[in-house]
């Protein structure tokens, strides 16, 4: 491959050197900010050697080359553009300037939640392992693994302790991540999160029960009666409080003399935010988060297969808009209240959609004669089955439309089936074949049935529609 030639073609098809504001690359994609997207020749980019897909998102135009190739194309591109190496965060910042309010909101939530996902995934998967080990009848009728092997009881309890940690101390993780995103000191954000789950406070998990029994303790400060209750497992209170903390900190630094800054600024920022957190932000945020999770769970449980069908059908188009990033916050809230919600229904539906996109992509590979397209479709389809849908969706399915439509239909029908049987996940993970450990043990069989339905329908429809398209072309 002539990478200099490929890079020059990319520049030309993007509207020329003067139309490019910033450029970087990640593991598989060129990430470019252009001044005018109307100048982009999408058909021309599609025909450039090595290009596996393209799409616009978050103010950036991204071209998929794949690992091992993208870095070489970028090296040639940056040389031709006369720019130094840029980080993806720098390009993202440049792209953000072009985004609307809704896009910035979605990106903001993603920037906060994506860094903490490994902790949530680890805790969630361990929670799934704990559930499998303690579920009666999962391996042996009327008994669980601990009943069969009492010697591992402490190990199982230890697994449960680790599994719960990210959710119990979720405000600490979110406080750090959100305050950093809002431009404040992340360690002050972590301290704020610690305050919200301080052991001296009543357990936030049992707030409703404690309130019903009349056992709530109070602080009496400035004539206010403030509940001494923690915010374990909550999302909204710490997000809002982190924004207040960062805003206060930045404004205080403007007026506090530099020699007093390290003393006065953190003191007043944390004290004022803490007071607001327990008097206004926390109580309102707790109710808002509870209403959101309760409302979504009620809709899923009430609408049943109809709600599942609608959500499953629309999930892939939602992914295209980037709005699916907001689901991380909702899922985190649902999992944090798993005893009440039973888990998250979003993850299984996302898995049905991903499986459908992967199967449709493989169906396209089966029916198409173009060797280049097949070379892209096979690995992309396998990737989607494993939970990474980007290459399949943008590289093949959307490009030819009928695989994408077939996948939407497969996802809708399979999501209706799993919704009918109330399939839920008790952990996050890769939404696809690797997501099996995340599913509630009593839902595992129907989850597998759902994946089979999703893949079968998407693959079959893609082959039928593909052959029909070929006949029309002839």
From Swiss-Prot:
Gene Ontology CC: plasma membrane
Recorded GO MF terms: kinase activity; protein-N(PI)-phosphohistidine-sucrose phosphotransferase system transporter activity; protein-phosphocysteine-trehalose phosphotransferase system transporter activity
Chief location bin: membrane
InterPro entries to which the protein is assigned, alphabetical: Glu_permease_IIB (IPR036878), PTrfase_EIIB_Cys (IPR018113), PTS_EIIC (IPR003352), PTS_EIIC_1 (IPR013013), PTS_IIB_1 (IPR001996), PTS_IIBC_sucr (IPR010973), PTS_Sugar-Specific_Components (IPR050558)
A Pfam family the protein falls into: PTS_EIIC
Protein's membrane topology: Multi-pass membrane protein
Keywords noted in UniProt: Cell inner membrane, Cell membrane, Kinase, Membrane, Phosphotransferase system, Sugar transport, Transferase, Transmembrane, Transmembrane helix, Transport
Intracellular or extracellular location(s): Cell inner membrane
GO biological process per UniProt: phosphoenolpyruvate-dependent sugar phosphotransferase system; trehalose transport
Catalytic-site annotation from UniProt: 26
Domain PTS EIIB type-1: 4-87
Signal peptide: none
Transmembrane feature ranges: 109-129, 158-178, 182-202, 229-249, 264-284, 303-323, 345-365, 376-396, 403-423, 444-464
Hydrolase keyword on record: no
Occurrences of domain PTS EIIC type-1 (ranges): 107-474
Entry remark concerning the domains of this protein: The PTS EIIB type-1 domain is phosphorylated by phospho-EIIA on a cysteinyl residue. Then, it transfers the phosphoryl group to the sugar substrate concomitantly with the sugar uptake processed by the PTS EIIC type-1 domain.
Function per UniProt: The phosphoenolpyruvate-dependent sugar phosphotransferase system (sugar PTS), a major carbohydrate active transport system, catalyzes the phosphorylation of incoming sugar substrates concomitantly with their translocation across the cell membrane. This system is involved in sucrose transport.
PANTHER family referenced in this protein's UniProt entry, alphabetically: PHOSPHOTRANSFERASE SYSTEM TRANSPORT PROTEIN, PTS SYSTEM TREHALOSE-SPECIFIC EIIBC COMPONENT
Name under which the protein is recorded: PTS system sucrose-specific EIIBC component
The organism of origin for this protein: Pasteurella multocida (strain Pm70)
Chain's gene name: scrA
